[in-house]
C-alpha cells in the first residue's frame, strides 16, 4: 500500500479528495474542455451512486457535477488498464441519462448535455493522443453528427501529440501522473 506522500492524482483517494473541492474540479474541467467561462452550479459530488433496481448493477461515479448551463459532468481517474472502458463509459452514460428525466417529461430534448471524462496513464486507443473525444456520428456520412448531447472524452497522461492540444492541458495531464509531494508546482 502506498503512503499518502506517494499518491498521485490518478490514485482514487487523492483524486476524490481534491476534486471534492468545487474550485479544483471546476478548474480541471475548464482546462480539459478549454472553456474559461465554465462555472459549476452545484458542488462536486464524489462517489455518487446511481441505482435502478436491487437486482441490477449500480454505478459509482468518481466526481459528478453540473455547470450553470445545466451540463452534467462525470470525471473519472482510471489507473488500471481495462479493455472494457469504452463499454463502461456507455453504461455510465445510460445510467446518467436515466436519472435526468422525470416521469411525465414528454420531450427527450429535456435531457441535459453530458460529458463523461476518463483520465488514464495509458493510451487506450494506441494512437499517441493526449485526448480522444467521441460523439455519435453516421457511419455512411461521418460529417453528420447525431447531436444527442453526449460527449465522451478519454484523456491519456502519456500522449505524444503536443502540437494538437493546449500546453495547459498537457501540463495538467502530466501533473495528474506526477503529483506527489516531491513535485514542485
Residue ranges: model-predicted function:
Residues 1-185:
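Elongated, amphipathic alpha-helical interaction scaffolds
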Amino acid at each position: 500500500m502506498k503512503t499518502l506522500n506517494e499518491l498521485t492524482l490518478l490514485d482514487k483517494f487523492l483524486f476524490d479528495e481534491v476534486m471534492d473541492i468545487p474550485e479544483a474540479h471546476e478548474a480541471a474541467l475548464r482546462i480539459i474542455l478549454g472553456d474559461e467561462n465554465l462555472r459549476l452550479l452545484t458542488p462536486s459530488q464524489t462517489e455518487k451512486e446511481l441505482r435502478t433496481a436491487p437486482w441490477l448493477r449500480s454505478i459509482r461515479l468518481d466526481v459528478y457535477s453540473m455547470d450553470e448551463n445545466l451540463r452534467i459532468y462525470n470525471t473519472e481517474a482510471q489507473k488500471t488498464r481495462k479493455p472494457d472502458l469504452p463499454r463502461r463509459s456507455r453504461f455510465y452514460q445510460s445510467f446518467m441519462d436515466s436519472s435526468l428525466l422525470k416521469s411525465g417529461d414528454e420531450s427527450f430534448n429535456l435531457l441535459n448535455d453530458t460529458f463523461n471524462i476518463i483520465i488514464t496513464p495509458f493510451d487506450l486507443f494506441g494512437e499517441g493522443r493526449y485526448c480522444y473525444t467521441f460523439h455519435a456520428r453516421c457511419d455512411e456520412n461521418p460529417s453528420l453528427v447525431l447531436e444527442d448531447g453526449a460527449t465522451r472524452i478519454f484523456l491519456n497522461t502519456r500522449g505524444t501529440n503536443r502540437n494538437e492540444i493546449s500546453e495547459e492541458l498537457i501540463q495538467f495531464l502530466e501533473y495528474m501522473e506526477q503529483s506527489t509531494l516531491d513535485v514542485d508546482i
